[in-house]
Design a protein with these regions (language model features):
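Soluble non-transmembrane domains of integral membrane proteins
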Residues: 1-230
């Protein structure tokens, strides 16, 4: 939920964006072709103070000889969150790992103040198209795929959005698909494969935005992200 924004004008209840009741969630990490998504089983969390007063939360876990660390760096003023995923191996065999990010939800309409329901859907930005809507019907008709340098992916609704923004100097494979059994749509991207060897580590960093459509803040985070704003 967003602490500084209320559901009703003058109300005390915070506005909820990511909501398990709508099956609306975001995640990042690694997967392998043999094991699928690697489950970190986080068992430890610590908090520290970073540069300019930023709150940093670090989660740590271990599964089958692989250590996981997720560092979450919260912006003091804005709604952008820097996320660093790191894995270290104590396994003798080399493992090919793929960094990924994901936003997943169903197509339930979003209830807003005044009982108004507004547009909800995915948007992609790439070198091919700086602002490409690919709605729920499009995804059902055909899964989305586009390989591009930089870019970003977002789920937008009236006034608010969630978005993942990767390393702009690297190439990423953007995707969207529908899981009929679960009734959920997922959008995201994968980054370049890495070889995880014994004693080595792989790090992936991304920016996650969850909050209102603030043009200046969005433009400062990444080029064309302010195109998500309704004028």
């Amino acid at each position: 939920f967003l602490k500084n924004i209320s559901l009703e004008k003058g109300g005390e209840d915070p506005f909820v964006v990511l909501d398990p009741n709508n099956s609306y969630s975001a995640n990042s990490g690694f997967y392998t072709r043999s094991q699928g998504y690697l489950r970190p089983n986080f068992s430890k969390i610590s908090e520290s103070l970073g540069v300019n007063g930023k709150n940093i939360y670090t989660l740590e876990g271990e599964t089958n000889g692989i250590s996981f660390k997720k560092k979450i760096e919260m912006d003091v003023v804005g709604y952008g969150i820097k996320i660093f995923d790191e894995i270290t191996s104590t396994i003798n065999d080399d493992i090919t790992v793929t960094p990924y990010v994901l936003i997943e939800r169903d197509n339930s309409p979003v209830k807003e103040s005044g009982l108004m329901y507004t547009y909800l859907g995915p948007v992609f930005s790439s070198t091919r198209d700086t602002y490409e809507k690919y709605d729920f019907d499009d995804i059902k008709d055909a899964p989305y795929q586009n390989k591009t340098f930089g870019g970003w992916v977002a789920f937008i609704q009236h006034y608010f959005l969630t978005a993942w923004i990767p390393d702009q100097s690297a190439e990423h494979l953007y995707q969207a698909r529908y899981n009929e059994n679960r009734g959920k749509y997922s959008v995201g991207y994968t980054s370049k494969d890495s070889i995880l060897s014994y004693g080595s580590k792989v790090v992936s960093s991304n920016v996650f935005y969850v909050g209102p459509k603030l043009p200046k803040q969005l433009a400062n985070i990444e080029e064309n992200l302010d195109l998500t704003v309704d004028y």
